[in-house]
Amino acid sequence: MNNPPLATQFEHRDDVGTTSQPEASISMTASPGRIRVVNPNCNEDVTRGLDAALEPLRFANGPEIVCSTLAEGPFGIETQADVESVVMPLRRLVEADNSSDAFVIACYSDPGLQVCREGTTRPVFGIAECGVLTALTRADRFGVIAISQRSIARHMRYLLQMGLKDRLASERPLEMSVAETASGDQTLRRMVEVGRQLKARDGAEAVVMGCAGMARHRRPLEEELGIPVIDPTQAAVAMALGAVQFSRA
């Protein structure tokens, strides 16, 4: 019996309807590279939201950005048990993928980040790490919007490991599920409420969205708050683009 695929993929193609090139011409043209963005939960709505949010980072002759969904993942990663459950499936996915030049783990808990880095010589980016580092380039103190209260302790442990807890103004929860943040009609309204609290009460000068499922709300949230809002998946893919481009320079 065939094993189920590790992931499903959303791939953008720009070559449909074009005239094929001679084989010799193709071999002389270096590949622009490929970045694989992995949603470690199995919610396809989240992956579609990521794919749409990453469209501004796709450009002519640039690396291909492919978003995929981890078939073995839970519907949402909301507990430490959820985090641990996807570590080895992510490692196997990275080891089995010989066509990607960089990987992005699109979950704010950065599940399996170090384990995946051990499994490949290619760069692996975690969105929490990249989102926080990007926020520090925009503000002295940043705030984080979490999906729920129980996520915050996990995020705090990670910030302590990074040595950056003193730069955190505060982290406040939406008290929503991952699925609700990706598709709920009230998500943006609630994010604006929490973002205003981070800005006015806690002194945050930038806000990091603490869940990949929030990706589609970055721009309207930034317009409402009037301070930088960081989508950590966009931040991670931007870093991956730089890594892939410079590796081919």
Regions found by a protein language model. Give the residues of each.
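Periplasmic-binding protein-like
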Residues: V37-V38, D101-C107, G203-C211
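Short, well-structured alpha-helical segments in soluble
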Residues: E84-S99, R189-G203
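Active-site rim beta-loop-alpha module in soluble metabolic enzymes
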Residues: A153-R201, E205-G210
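N-terminal beta-loop-helix "entrance" segment that forms/cooperates
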Residues: S68-R91, A179-G184
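Short, flexible loop segments at boundaries between secondary-structure elements
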Residues: D231-R248
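Glycine/small-residue-rich loop that forms an oxyanion/phosphate-binding "nest" at active or ligand-binding sites
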Residues: V87-T134, R138, V144
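N-terminal beta1-alpha1 ligand-phosphate binding loop
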Residues: G33-L57
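Short, glycine-/small-residue-rich phosphate/pyrophosphate-handling segment
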Residues: D45, L136-L174, Q245-A249
